[in-house]
């Protein structure tokens, strides 16, 4: 039995050197040693899909490793045994990735891995006799390139930065939960990942998990399909820190919202840190349960806005320095003046500057900058979804034509029911087809307040669920807007 465990450990150590952290985590984290004879090692997989995929991807390589290590007669057999997988927890004497003791080719070289959680893998290294690796909790989806040190601060993001750094130093103490909100490409993910990396550095025993809302949803759906919801709950409710990116992607998805609600409560009651990001304030989320929105507002909600000119210049200068670009400061200032959208676009502009310099061997002037800006705009349009391609004027024209209204009607203060309803619909469509905030939408619709616009959006959202006629009208208007 022990010899079989040692051989399986040897296989794991060899394979992990050949795979990325993410791949190793996905395919081997939930495999468990069950039993062994002189000729056969049995490994438990959580479900038939996982078993089949591991066999398809790695059976040949595992056999090669066995031959390389002098175990020609031994076979590794994978078994679909979810019950065995569930019972092999951290206290189990059976071997898994949580307790790997890998025997190398000679007794003088032994590597012992002590991995204390299921979600975390650390790179394999060679150690001399009796050396131990006390691995920390390592999230394979945390990217080391995101740090507080390389996050450039300014008036638009200083509060979010300070709060994030404070959370990393003292998780679960002050700002719990914390929600960072703002538009696309402004640095929300950078801060979220920086929190994870700094916390990992300062609190090595912490179980930290960074996950996008999309992956959180997909994992939840898969757990239902494979009857593994208990495993899913255990994974997320026994963390020290949950970093959930882009929660707006969970709008209109009631099942996962319910699961997140209970996960939130479990972590909150245990004083475990939670940080979320969103492209809008919680109050502006559509088809999102009120009780979950109220949970987000329990702690700190902090926004990141578009960078001002000085910050844009600083971002561009740093990117130019990293890329080894030498151009006059006047050119960098010109880029900062023209690209006012977000950090992502600023960095894209610098990348294109470098391409023009390297490939065309030309001096950058104002006409080149203008050309680059146009390329960025085209690129963004080509890669955004249909909603973002729709401009405000297109939406307005459809509303006026189909509802037989005038500019004065839609932007005025008439209390006529049909005109009031049209303004509600206009606000709703602007929110769904653009990235405008409620304040920006309010300015378009005759200077309405944030609360008025939010009321309009929520009203139409609810009516679509209860009124078939309204729902059909909205669908018809959306189809016409998409054709513009």
Curated annotation (Swiss-Prot):
Transmembrane intervals: none
Region (Domain III, AAA+ region): 141-357
MF term (GO), any: ATP hydrolysis activity
GO biological process: DNA replication initiation; regulation of DNA replication
Domain IV, binds dsDNA, as annotated region: 358-484
Keywords associated with the record: ATP-binding, Cytoplasm, DNA replication, DNA-binding, Lipid-binding, Nucleotide-binding
Positions of ATP binding: 185, 187-189
Highest taxon in the source lineage: Bacteria
Region: Domain I, interacts with DnaA modulators, residue numbers: 1-73
InterPro entries per UniProt: AAA+_ATPase, Chromosome_initiator_DnaA, Chromosome_initiator_DnaA-like, Chromosome_initiator_DnaA_CS, DnaA_C, DnaA_dom, DnaA_N_dom, DnaA_N_sf
One GO CC annotation: cytoplasm
Residues annotated as signal peptide: none
Chain segments carrying region Domain II: 73-140
Subcellular location: Cytoplasm
NCBIfam families cross-referenced by the UniProt entry: DnaA (TIGR00362)
Family: Belongs to the DnaA family.
Domain comment quoted from the record: Domain I is involved in oligomerization and binding regulators, domain II is flexibile and of varying length in different bacteria, domain III forms the AAA+ region, while domain IV binds dsDNA.
Function according to Swiss-Prot or TrEMBL: Plays an essential role in the initiation and regulation of chromosomal replication. ATP-DnaA binds to the origin of replication (oriC) to initiate formation of the DNA replication initiation complex once per cell cycle. Binds the DnaA box (a 9 base pair repeat at the origin) and separates the double-stranded (ds)DNA. Forms a right-handed helical filament on oriC DNA; dsDNA binds to the exterior of the filament while single-stranded (ss)DNA is stabiized in the filament's interior.
Subunit structure and binding partners: Oligomerizes as a right-handed, spiral filament on DNA at oriC.
HAMAP family according to UniProt: DnaA_bact
Protein known as: Chromosomal replication initiator protein DnaA
């Amino acid at each position: 039995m022990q010899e079989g465990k040692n051989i399986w450990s040897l296989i794991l150590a060899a394979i992990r050197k050949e795979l990325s952290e993410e791949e190793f985590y996905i395919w081997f984290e939930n495999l468990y040693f069950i039993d062994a004879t002189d000729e056969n090692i049995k490994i438990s997989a959580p479900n038939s899909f996982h078993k089949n995929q591991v066999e398809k991807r790695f059976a040949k390589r595992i056999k090669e490793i066995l031959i390389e290590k002098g175990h020609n007669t031994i076979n590794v057999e994978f078994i679909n045994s979810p019950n065995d997988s569930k019972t092999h927890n951290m206290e189990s004497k059976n071997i898994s990735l949580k307790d790997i003791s890998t025997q190398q080719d000679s007794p003088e070289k032994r590597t012992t891995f002590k991995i204390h959680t299921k979600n975390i893998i650390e790179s394999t290294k060679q150690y001399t006799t009796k050396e131990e690796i006390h691995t920390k909790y390592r999230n394979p989806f945390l990217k080391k390139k995101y740090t507080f040190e390389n996050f450039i601060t300014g008036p638009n993001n200083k509060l979010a930065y300070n709060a994030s750094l404070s959370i990393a130093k003292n998780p679960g103490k002050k700002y719990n939960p914390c929600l960072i909100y703002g538009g696309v490409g402004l640095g929300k993910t950078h801060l979220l990942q920086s929190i994870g990396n700094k916390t990992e550095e300062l609190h090595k025993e912490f179980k930290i998990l960074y996950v996008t809302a999309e992956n959180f949803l997909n994992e939840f759906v898969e757990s239902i399909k494979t009857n593994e919801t208990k495993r899913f709950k255990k994974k997320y409710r026994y963390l020290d820190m949950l970093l959930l990116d882009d929660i707006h992607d969970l709008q209109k998805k009631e099942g996962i919202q319910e699961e997140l609600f209970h996960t939130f409560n479990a972590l909150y009651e245990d004083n475990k840190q939670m940080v979320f990001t969103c492209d809008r304030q919680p109050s502006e989320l559509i088809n999102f349960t009120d009780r979950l929105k109220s949970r987000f507002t329990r702690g700190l909600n902090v926004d990141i806005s578009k960078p001002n000119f000085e910050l844009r210049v600083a971002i561009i200068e740093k990117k130019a320095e990293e890329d080894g670009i030498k151009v006059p400061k006047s050119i960098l200032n010109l880029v900062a003046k023209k690209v006012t959208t977000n950090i992502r676009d600023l960095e894209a502009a610098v990348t294109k500057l470098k391409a023009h310099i390297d490939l065309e061997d030309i001096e950058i002037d104002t006409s080149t900058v203008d050309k680059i800006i146009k390329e960025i705009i085209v690129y963004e349009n080509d890669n955004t979804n249909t909603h973002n391609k729709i401009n405000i004027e297109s939406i307005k024209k459809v509303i006026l034509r189909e509802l037989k209204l005038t500019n004065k009607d839609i932007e005025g203060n008439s209390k006529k029911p049909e005109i009031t309803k049209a303004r509600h619909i206009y606000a709703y469509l602007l929110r769904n087809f653009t990235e405008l905030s409620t304040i920006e939408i309010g300015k378009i619709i005759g200077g309405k307040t944030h609360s008025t616009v939010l009321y309009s959006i929520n009203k139409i959202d609810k009516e679509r669920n209860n009124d078939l006629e309204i729902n059909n009208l909205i669908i018809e208007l959306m189809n016409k807007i998409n054709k513009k």
